[in-house]
A protein has these predicted regions:
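Long, aromatic- and glycine/proline-rich binding clefts that accommodate carbohydrate-like moieties
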Residues: 126-128, 288-291, 338-393, 397, ...
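A structural signal for short loop-to-beta-strand junctions that line the ligand-binding cleft
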Residues: 80-81, 87-89, 119-155, 184-185, ...
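Extracytoplasmic "Venus flytrap"
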Residues: 32-49, 66-69, 379-382
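Extracytoplasmic "Venus flytrap"/periplasmic binding protein-like
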Residues: 32, 56-125, 129-132, 158-166, ...
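Extracytoplasmic/periplasmic substrate-recognition and gating elements
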Residues: 30, 52, 56, 160, ...
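Glycine-centered hinge/linker elements that transmit conformational signals in sensory
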Residues: 175, 217-248
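Short, solvent-exposed loop/beta-turn-alpha elements that line the ligand-binding surface or hinge
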Residues: 111-124, 206-231, 279-283, 292-299
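Periplasmic solute-binding protein
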Residues: 98-106, 127-166, 172, 191-216, ...
Length: 427
């Protein structure tokens, strides 16, 4: 560090000019504390895109990072921070929880940013509605993940003379061929959330869009405990025979690596798995295909990563918050962030030229499903965590314990729905 001498007045003048310029540049800079779960791998790489954008705007990014497997811990810590009057600037939370926070009056209104950036025009209505409370924006979306993907190791598929399945009959025929050839047909982890994603895929593929909405959006007890759900559960359990030995708590990345190494043939997983497959394609020559899960080729089950924006006190933090909201939905950030994340831009009209074929396919399918009315939210998008948690536990228990009947599981699903105290969502 260079020190200035009091014997050099010209040095003082230059220093004061430098300080003045620095103060002018940072007069509106603020700290942006963000609660998120993007702490490893490609998620962390994608988060760096957001950090860099905010740093270019002169703001300081502060991570409030929590493990995605923290169960109820993140919400507990967030609640404690909010109640103490010291909330983070933004928090990555699910859309039903956004509505809960909004009803408590602790979220910031960013309609001024939304109007300036034309959010009502550049966002799909199914997404923009979820970001609003009583007609005002209180949150900002980052991306769209497709949930109903089936990933296939094409070398394994060719070796067993299998075909890319579009129906469940075709799927089980392919799975049987892979199993007989000594492969694990379906790579699957042993975590409850993975069990539930697989179940969602089966429910949509077996029951169809109307059934899915009745069961998991409107919580119709006849759908949750009827003959179609019984068929869904039967199909779901049948897959278990092709998943190999289930290891409780096995991370999804370890399951995906089975596909990469050629030990497994297929995997049901959202498109956050894609960067891993793309890396393997580049480094190890992996040949993989991404196709809609069986039975739901025209449907698109989606999840959106979103940030609730909390009321903050200082003008500098408010400025940082508004800049964050604007930057997150800017075309440039949408493109770079989603290229790293494996998802697709939530903003309409972003150029997908640099995206891989799966990204382009996902974007086209999302638009087509929106037009056809076959766009459905993932359960995590549709239901509050308290209900989703009970349903997830019931489905995971059914998967891991063959002694549990489909009838008992359906009763647990209905009980979860009846215990739901869901105030009507207001947009």
């Amino acid at each position: 560090m260079a020190y200035l001498s009091i014997r050099n007045p010209s040095g003082w003048g230059a220093a004061m000019a430098l300080v003045a310029a620095s103060l002018a540049a940072t007069a509106h800079a603020g700290e942006l504390e963000v609660l998120h779960f993007w702490d490893v791998g490609d998620d962390a790489k994608a988060a760096q895109v957001l950090k860099a954008a905010m740093q270019r705007d002169g703001h300081t990014w502060k991570d409030f990072v929590l493990s995605a497997d923290g169960n109820g811990v993140p919400l507990t810590l967030l609640r404690s921070r909010v109640l103490s009057g010291n909330p983070p600037t933004a928090a990555q939370i699910k859309t039903p929880v956004i509505q809960q926070w909004a009803r408590q009056g602790v979220l910031a209104n960013v309609d001024d940013v939304a109007r300036a950036e034309h959010w009502d025009t550049v966002l799909p209505k199914a997404v923009s509605d979820a970001m609003k409370y009583k007609g005002s924006y209180v949150a900002v979306p980052a991306n769209v993940h497709r949930i109903n993907w089936l990933w296939i190791n094409m070398r394994v598929l060719r070796q067993v003379n299998g075909r890319v399945p579009t129906t469940w009959d075709e799927f089980f025929a392919t799975a049987e061929a892979m199993k007989r050839a000594g492969y694990v047909a379906v790579a699957h982890g042993g975590q409850p959330w993975q069990d539930f994603i697989l179940f969602e895929n089966v429910a949509l593929g077996v029951g169809g869009v109307d059934f899915y909405r009745k069961a998991f959006v409107t919580l119709d007890p006849d759908a949750l405990a009827g003959p179609v759900m019984a068929q869904v559960l039967q199909t779901f359990r049948r897959i278990k025979a092709y998943a190999g030995p289930t290891v409780m708590g096995r991370d999804w990345i370890l399951a995906s690596s089975m596909l990469v190494k050629g030990r497994a043939g297929m995997q049901f997983m959202g498109d956050w798995a894609k960067p891993l497959f793309l890396a393997a394609q580049k480094d190890a020559g992996l040949e993989f295909s991404c196709v809609p899960a069986p039975g739901a080729t025209k449907a698109y089950a989606f999840a959106v990563d979103s940030f609730a924006l909390f009321k903050v006190k200082s003008a500098a933090r408010v400025k940082a918050q508004k800049d964050f909201a604007a930057e997150l939905l800017s075309p440039a950030v949408q493109e770079e962030f989603n290229l790293d994340k494996g998802s697709i831009p939530v903003r309409l009209g972003v150029d997908l030229t640099r995206f891989d074929r799966c990204g382009k396919q996902s974007g086209a399918a999302f638009d087509a499903a929106a037009r056809a009315g076959t766009l459905v939210p993932s359960v995590s998008m549709a239901l509050p965590p308290a209900i989703e948690d009970v349903m997830r536990e019931a489905i995971s228990a059914y998967w891991h314990d063959d002694r549990i009947s489909a009838q008992a599981t359906m009763q647990r699903l209905v009980a979860a729905a009846r215990g739901a105290a869901m105030p009507p969502r207001t947009h």
